[in-house]
């Protein structure tokens, strides 16, 4: 039988877990592993260490994600909080410390988290790849030609070449990787009413147009054709450089009555009190989107729809009674869409949850998805 002194001596020779060598994995292997993880978890991973924060924003990681075909849509939301002139951006993340117990309480496990860098003014927004473009708008109550880019990989802003004309909240749409901007001018000049930004050459060029509407209520793109809804409704096909009217699809006019709309897989969806509808081109009529259990009683003065990687992101607000109606709660739902045998479209609510509490004075600027 060994003595206690001998036991202590023997134990002291055994290496402790803290002193055991743990060589770091090569960066390229770590990048390969992280590239296979959903980006929804990157904010949690960035809390691990300084090196992990660097890795989750590195260009190499996103190149690897693309190589492995692991790119995904990431939802971004822009809000105004008067009197602060600077809009604030939020993005959909997985909640940190989400556990099994919480999931059993009907929690989605998602949260709208603020990104640290703010954009300097409100503007029209579009997304191309991993970048969100903020175009024109108003700076100190004057139209602006400024174009800023939010790099969604690193959540940093940088400037792009300015437009040729100053525009106050123009219509902005993306066709074949180019940004077409129309309206928002103080002068009625059809030769300058629309211009296009080529991302590859980083240049702006005017697009000759037959009209010069100051106010544009809505604009969208279906099958490569831009639809512009103002006092007049016109269409433009960039590939053919051809202008036209809505014609047989006059019933598609969104006018002023639709609170929100989006195009998903070349199908137009819109919301107005009573529910969400989609436009059936063949019959030239609106049809109700079925299958939205739990959202049928949705009634809000502020509803936003967005294409979320082929699914629909639906955001709305509601008063918080205990706040004396001084605060709103912003909720989010993700809806998958499926074509039915009868040529209809049916939605399925994958999840919905309260995301964010905001003051009642806020303004909902927009929601869109970047690809990362």
UniProtKB/Swiss-Prot annotation:
Q: Which UniProt keywords apply?
A: Kelch repeat, Repeat
The biased composition feature labelled Basic residues covers 1-11
Under the heading Gene3D superfamilies, the entry gives: Kelch-type beta propeller
UniProt superkingdom: Eukaryota
Q: InterPro entries this protein is in? A: F-box-like_dom_sf, F-box/kelch-repeat_ARATH, F-box_dom, Kelch-typ_b-propeller, Kelch_1
> Is Repeat set as a keyword in this record?
yes
**F-box domain: which residues?**
19-65
CDD domains reported in the protein's UniProt record: F-box_AtAFR-like
Pfam families membership: F-box (PF00646), Kelch_FKB95 (PF25210)
Q: Where is this region: Disordered?
A: 1-24
Start-end of each Kelch repeat: 131-177, 179-224, 226-271, 273-312
Q: What is this protein called?
A: F-box/kelch-repeat protein At5g49000
Organism classification? Eukaryota, Viridiplantae, Streptophyta, Embryophyta, Tracheophyta
């Amino acid at each position: 039988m060994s003595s206690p002194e001998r036991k202590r001596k023997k134990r002291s020779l055994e290496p402790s877990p803290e002193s055991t060598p743990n060589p770091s994995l090569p960066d390229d292997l770590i990048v390969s592993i992280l590239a296979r993880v959903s980006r929804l978890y990157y904010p949690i991973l960035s809390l691990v260490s300084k090196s992990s924060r660097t890795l989750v924003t590195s260009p190499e990681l996103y190149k690897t994600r693309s190589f492995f075909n692991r790119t995904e849509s990431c939802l971004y939301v822009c809000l105004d909080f008067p009197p602060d002139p600077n809009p604030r951006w939020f993005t959909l993340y997985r909640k940190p410390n989400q556990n099994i117990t919480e999931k059993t309480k009907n929690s989605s496990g998602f949260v709208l988290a603020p990104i640290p860098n703010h954009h300097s003014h409100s503007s029209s927004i579009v997304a191309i790849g991993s970048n969100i473009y903020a175009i024109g708008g108003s700076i100190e109550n004057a139209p602006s030609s400024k174009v800023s880019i939010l790099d969604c990989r690193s959540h940093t802003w940088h400037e792009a070449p300015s437009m040729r004309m100053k525009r106050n909240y123009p219509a902005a749409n993306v066709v074949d990787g180019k940004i077409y901007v129309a309206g928002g001018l103080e002068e009625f000049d059809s030769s300058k009413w629309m211009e296009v930004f080529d991302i590859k050459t980083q240049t702006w060029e005017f697009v000759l147009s037959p009209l010069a509407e100051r106010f544009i209520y809505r604009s969208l793109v279906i099958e490569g054709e831009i639809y512009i809804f103002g006092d007049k409704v016109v269409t433009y096909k960039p590939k053919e450089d051809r202008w036209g009217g809505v014609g047989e699809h006059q019933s598609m006019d969104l006018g002023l009555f639709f609170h929100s709309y989006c195009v998903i897989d070349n199908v137009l969806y819109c919301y107005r009190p009573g529910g969400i509808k989609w436009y059936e081109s063949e019959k030239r009529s609106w049809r109700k989107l079925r299958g939205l259990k739990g959202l049928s009683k949705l009634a809000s003065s502020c509803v936003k729809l967005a294409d979320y990687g082929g699914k629909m992101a639906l955001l709305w607000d509601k008063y918080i009674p205990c706040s004396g109606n001084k605060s709103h709660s912003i909720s989010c739902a993700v809806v998958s869409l499926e074509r039915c045998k009868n040529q209809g479209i049916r939605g399925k609510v994958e999840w919905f949850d309260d995301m964010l509490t905001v003051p009642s004075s806020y303004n909902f600027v927009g929601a869109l998805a970047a690809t990362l």
